[in-house]
Structure formats: structure tokens, C-alpha cells
Amino acid sequence: MMELLQITNDPALARRCDALPGMRLFVDLETHGKAERQTGRNTFITTHQSEDVGRIKAQLQRARLMVRLNPLHPGTSAELDTVLAQGADSVMLPMFQTPDELRAFSRIVAGRAPIVALLETSGALRSVDD
């Protein structure tokens, strides 16, 4: 089986993707530090907003919806509550460095949704066994 992943905040594209088996839609709300990390690189930074979560979820019958939040910060709990209220099926934690950060995020999520831990930092990779 193959899982397909599409980052979008476009309802029409979400509807088309929803017809495909194994599809996961992905709303990207990460903004904290992203511009600084990607300065000088030929990358695209999304302009997704929290309202996009509900707009995309409303288009889906089969596909699951994942939302990438900001790295752990004082507003994480409020961000999480907002996206879960709009129907996020899973949440992603980016840019964490330590197992303690991931555990803190897990405590905030408190079993309300599956967590996707994005292993994109050297600290995160070193902490895999923890």
C-alpha cells in the first residue's frame, strides 16, 4: 500500500484528492522561525491559516487530514485546540530537538489525536531511542 500526501489549503484540490485511495491531506500552519531557516533557499513557504483546517476537512469523506503546527511554544495548547475543533485527524510537531519537547507536546495533545513527530533536526534524530 502507498500513502499519498498533499499539502494544500485549496478546497477544490482537496475534493479531487479525496477520491484517491490512501490519501492524506496536510494543512501547514508552521510559521515560527520558518522564514529564517529557509532564507536563501529556493523553497516555498505556505500561507495556510487555521481557518483552512475546517475548510479542507469539510471537503473530505475518505482522506485523513494532518495539520503541522508550530514548534512547541507557549501558544501550542491554543493552536492545538483550534485545529482539533476544526477536525484535524492528526497533528505534526516540527523542529523539536529533544525527547522532552516531544513528551511535552504529547501531554498537551493528551490522546486527542495521533501525533506525527517530524525528525528534521539533528537533536530529534539523536533522540530516536529515547
Task: Name every feature range the model reports, one short phrase each.
Residues 20, 59, 82-87, 104-109, ...:
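Alpha-helical structural signal in soluble globular domains
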Residues 7-32, 86-87:
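Catalytic domains of carbohydrate-active enzymes, especially glycoside hydrolases
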Residues 55-64:
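A structural motif corresponding to the C-terminal end of an alpha-helix
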Residues 2-8, 25-27, 63-69, 89-93, ...:
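Hydrophobic faces of well-ordered beta-strands that scaffold small-molecule active sites
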Residues 69-75, 83-90:
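Hydrophobic/aromatic-rich structural module bridging two neighboring secondary-structure elements via a short loop
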Residues 8-19, 73-82, 122-130:
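Short, acidic/polar
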Residues 26-27, 56, 83, 92-96:
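Long, contiguous hydrophobic alpha-helical segments, chiefly transmembrane helices and signal peptides
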Residues 33-56, 73-78, 95-113, 123-129:
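Active-site-adjacent beta->alpha loops and helix N-cap segments on the catalytic face
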